[in-house]
């Protein structure tokens, strides 16, 4: 029996390292749900509300730094994802949202629970498209996952329920995603200028934002050498506050006077 688009989609998620899909079972997601059952290498986490699923995917991506996935069925199912997707996108974590829709034959007819996912998710995603044919789906899914990983944000792929039930078309160039771990380093001249600045001052305070999230040890070491207090932004709290003897608190939203 030929592989269905839904099975192809699940295979590609597994290949990309996705461990779970947070979603509510039913309706236009039935084919994908059944494909998860058949695959056995990925877990369908049934939540009580799609908003919870989107937040859960964002939390998983933030904790593990890997692509996480949530899904919503047609109409209110995927509309409920939007709060969690905004949170994930603003937090800079890779999340793929599968926005299932009604059948393609009903597009543009004001059919029951019809929405325009392209408009709906435009402001909270790096990639946002709808696959209307089996040929499009693997290429769009690969592009969506790569955009989420490379951009550290949300990617949305709209998948009509009737498309997931059709026979899949294998696109061998679209079966692989590539994790990226870019390292941004200042030039030697900039580092020398910073060293001169720090050496020339007696009282120094370090203020760390989300850009310092992977430099906890370096921040602690530098603050120790300079005997400088360390303040941090809301987004960098989780990365900078812990085990930091010189931290003085957070600034901005929910901040404190010491910060």
Per-segment meaning from a language model:
Residues 1-259:
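N-terminal alpha/beta PP-like core and its mobile active-site loop of ThDP/TPP-dependent enzymes
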């Amino acid at each position: 029996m030929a592989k269905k688009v839904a099975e192809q989609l699940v295979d590609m998620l597994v290949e990309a390292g996705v461990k779970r899909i947070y979603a509510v079972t039913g309706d236009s997601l039935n084919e994908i749900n059944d494909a998860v059952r058949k695959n056995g290498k990925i877990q369908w986490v049934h939540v009580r509300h799609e908003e919870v699923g989107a937040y859960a995917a964002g939390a998983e991506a933030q904790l593990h730094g890997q692509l996480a996935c949530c899904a919503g069925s047609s109409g209110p199912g995927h509309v409920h994802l939007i709060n969690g997707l905004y949170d994930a996108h603003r937090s800079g974590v890779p999340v793929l949202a599968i926005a299932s829709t009604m059948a393609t034959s009903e597009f543009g007819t004001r059919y029951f629970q019809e929405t325009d996912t392209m408009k709906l998710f435009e402001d909270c995603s790096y990639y946002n498209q709808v696959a209307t044919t089996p040929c499009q789906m693997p290429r769009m899914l690969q592009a969506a996952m790569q955009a989420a990983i490379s951009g550290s944000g949300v990617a949305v792929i709209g998948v009509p329920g009737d498309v997931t039930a059709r026979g899949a078309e294998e696109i061998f160039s679209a079966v692989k995603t590539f994790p990226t771990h870019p390292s941004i380093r200042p030039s030697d001249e900039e580092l020398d200028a910073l060293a001169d600045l720090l050496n020339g001052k007696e009282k120094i305070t370090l203020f760390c934002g989300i850009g310092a999230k992977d430099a906890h040890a370096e921040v602690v070491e530098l603050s120790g050498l300079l005997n400088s207090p360390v303040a941090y932004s809301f987004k960098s709290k989780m990365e900078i506050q812990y085990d930091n003897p010189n931290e003085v608190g957070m600034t901005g939203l929910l901040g404190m006077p010491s910060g």
